[in-house]
Amino acid sequence: MLLSNVAVNRTVVHTQLVSGSRSALHALSRTSHSVPVTHTHQRRHIFSHKRRLSSSTLAIPFALSNTNSATTAPLQFLSNVSLCRVTPGTITTSAKATAPNLDKMSAEAATTAAQASASPVEDSFLKKAVSCQSETEREAVMAARAAKKALRETKETWWAPYVALTKPRLTVLVVLSAMSSYALTPEAVSLTNLLFLTVGTALCSGSANAINMGREPAYDSMMTRTRGRPVVRGAVTPNQAFTFAGITGTVGTAALYFGVNPTVAILGASNIALYGGLYTTLKRKHIINTWVGAVVGAIPPLMGWAASGGSLLHPGAWCLAGLLYAWQFPHFNALSYSIRDEYKKAGYVMTAWKNPGLNARVGLRYALLMFPLCVGLSYYNVTDWWFVLDSSVLNAWMAWWAFKFWQQENVNIALAAAGKQYSQNPFARKLFWGSVVHLPGVLLLAMIHKKGQWDWLFGPSEDEKKKTLSS
C-alpha cells in the first residue's frame, strides 16, 4: 500500500507513559498543522526492529488518524503508526515543502527527548546522521528518531528489563572466564558440574549487577553510558531490582552449592557482596574502588578451578586469577579516561579524573604484568611452553597501546602544567579495544595449549614420561 500526502494531526505530549518507557513521544510535533509529503513510499510498520536508520536512509514516523480524533491520546493510534522510507534526496525536497509547518517545533525539546530515550550508541549515531542536515531537517529527524524509539519500547517484553539488569555482556565475560579456568584444570571434566557452574555463575553475576543498578539510578542518569539502564528509565523500580537480585543470588548460590561444591558457592556469594556492596559504595568515595573491582573480576577463574576439584593452593589457579585481575586495569582505565568528565559530574571517584597520570601508569604496569603471568601458567604445567610464545604477541600488542596511552598522557600533563591546550588522548580508545580482543584471545590460546592437550597426536612430553616412570 502506497502513501501519498500523509497528514499528521496534533499529538498530545505526555509527561509519563506506561512503564516509563515511552517518554520519547515528547519529541513528536506539537503543531496542529498538517505535513504534506510529496513523494510516495512503501508503508512500514513502526514496530519493525529490523529497520535501522543509516547514513543513506532516514525514517519518519507519522501518526495516522482521521479528522475527528485530533484530541484523542496518541496511544490510541499506535496500531496506525507507520514508517515512510525516505532517501536523502527525498528528505530535502520534503523538508522544503514542510518547512512552514515545522517552524513551530522546538528543536531543543526534540533533541532532549531523543537523547533521553536513546542509548549511548544511538545518541552518537543520531548526531552523525543529522550533522549535515539543515536546522529544519534536523528537527524532523530527531523528532522521528525519538518517536520511533519510544514506540519500539512499547513493544518491549516484560522480561527484557530484567535481562538488562544482569548486564548480559559483562555476565557472559564472567561466565567465560570461569568456564575457561574449569577447562584448564588438570582434573577430569564433568558436563554436569560445568552446567551447574555456568548457570550458578551467571545468576550470581546477574544478582551483583542488579544490586549495582538498583543503588545508583540517580547517578547513572547523569551519564550517557548508563542513562539507558532499566532502573534509570523507570522500566523497573529499585525495589524490583533488589528483589530480582535476591532471587537470582539465592538460586545461583544454591546451584553452585548443591551442583558443584561449597567452596565455589562461597566464592560466588562473596562476589555478590564485593561488587554489589563494597565496590558500589567505594565508587563514590575513593579511587581504590578500581582495585576492589579487579578482585571481583579475578574470582570467577578461582570458581572454575575449584569447580573441577582442583586445589586453590595450586599456583596455576592464582596465575589465572592474576590474568583477570591485571587485565581489568588497562581495560577499565582506558574506558574511564574517555568518559572521565561524566564520571566526575556524576560524583564517581575515578583515577581517570582524580589523577590522570596515575591512571595511565597503572594501566601500563598491569599490561606488562601479563608477560610473567603467562610464563607462570606454563611453568606450573597448566599450559605447554608454546603458550608463552603465542600469548606474547597479544600481550605485546596490548602493552604497546598501554605504553602509548601513558606516553601521551605525560605529554598532556606537561602541556597542562605550562598552561597550553592539549587534545584528548587518542590512545585510550585503542587501548580499550585492544584489551577487548586481548582477554578472549589469551584464554583461547591457553585452552589450545593446555598441558597434555595434544599428547594423543604428538605423544607425551619428556616430563610426562618421567612422571609416568617414577609413579
Curated annotation (Swiss-Prot):
The gene is COX10. Residues 1-60 form a transit peptide. Its EC number is 2.5.1.141. It catalyses: heme b + (2E,6E)-farnesyl diphosphate + H2O = Fe(II)-heme o + diphosphate. One of its GO terms (cellular component) is mitochondrial membrane. One of its GO terms (biological process) is heme A biosynthetic process. This is Protoheme IX farnesyltransferase, mitochondrial. It comes from Yarrowia lipolytica (strain CLIB 122 / E 150) (Yeast). The keyword Transit peptide applies. One of its GO terms (molecular function) is protoheme IX farnesyltransferase activity. InterPro entries: Protohaem_IX_farnesylTrfase (IPR006369), Protohaem_IX_farnesylTrfase_mt (IPR016315), UbiA_prenyltransferase (IPR000537), UbiA_prenylTrfase_CS (IPR030470), UbiA_sf (IPR044878). Belongs to the UbiA prenyltransferase family. It is an enzyme of class 2 (transferase). Keywords: Heme biosynthesis, Membrane, Mitochondrion, Transferase, Transit peptide, Transmembrane, Transmembrane helix. It is found in: Mitochondrion membrane. Gene3D superfamilies: UbiA prenyltransferase (1.10.357.140). It is a multi-pass membrane protein. Converts protoheme IX and farnesyl diphosphate to heme O. The chain crosses the membrane at residues 188-208, 247-267, 287-307, 312-332, 368-388, 430-450. It comes from the Eukaryota. HAMAP family: CyoE_CtaB. Pfam families: UbiA.
